[in-house]
């Protein structure tokens, strides 16, 4: 990993410590459901018991920075987004700033998440219902991790396992690495190239075929040898795939990148995968490579019942776009549109999870083509911001919390006094 990557990782973990402090102190006292209370009690126990010396150092550093980082983050994002929210909703800058501070102490809401989760609207009532990134990335995910480690994050092995089981998945055409030469030729078609391991669309490139064994990324046109050399010079293994073209009905919903469904599945109480939630991701503006919302893309809610789309937005940490019923680049209608092959998309997500049954929670990226849905990849630590951005009530008051609490209980992490409690949750499509 590069020095910049290490610094970013350390900063991210420090933010998790800062955001997690109020949650750990409250130990679920303001949780909206018994399931959420159990999750937060488990998280609190883990928060104060670092696994490694490095984790202990990060805990101390994060606690020291709380009095500085929290007001500075609130100030920065108020300056960035506050005038826009004031114009749209009439809430003043001081009111937004003060509410961010109050919601930090009440629910661990730091800077950008106040705007990501639209907590400038009914924040005090809604904030405790959201499952925070710090709770999953620095807590619960580690406790839910399986021991066998199926190759979900290894893109080539992932594709091979899916192909062997007859699950439709984008194939790996070649892996390019200067340490281990792949003798396969590049397929003479449009290409999508990304790091062998990685997430968030970082490092991905799109190369369109412009002639026999020549490709262009919109700025450069290269032949096969030059293109292979470019990939080898990346300093890390790169996977080459044929670029997937979207279903014709979905082409108006993208500025060029292939749009995908992010489908969240989790193993239920009987050991069967269950579809929990889904969003649809789209590119807009100058982005023609990836649809990831963290890379500046759009997303919208998908009704599990019939595959209809809700209103769209970006991640929300930048409030300029806001919410829209139409695609901001193409003008095509988003809200109310029904995804093609929706029953098949749901079936594919469930079936794929059976191939990686040691993973309790998986986020699937699924493209919908003219021939039906096809898996792009699976994510072992799925991002909750992407899903909860489009929810009025968060995952703590949802089926997902019930399943997480059940698995924590089954693994012995939940205190005995909570084991007989019944949990009341809201189904996703009730939102």
Predicted regions and their residues:
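Intrinsically disordered, low-structural-confidence terminal and linker regions
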Residues: 1-62, 428-431
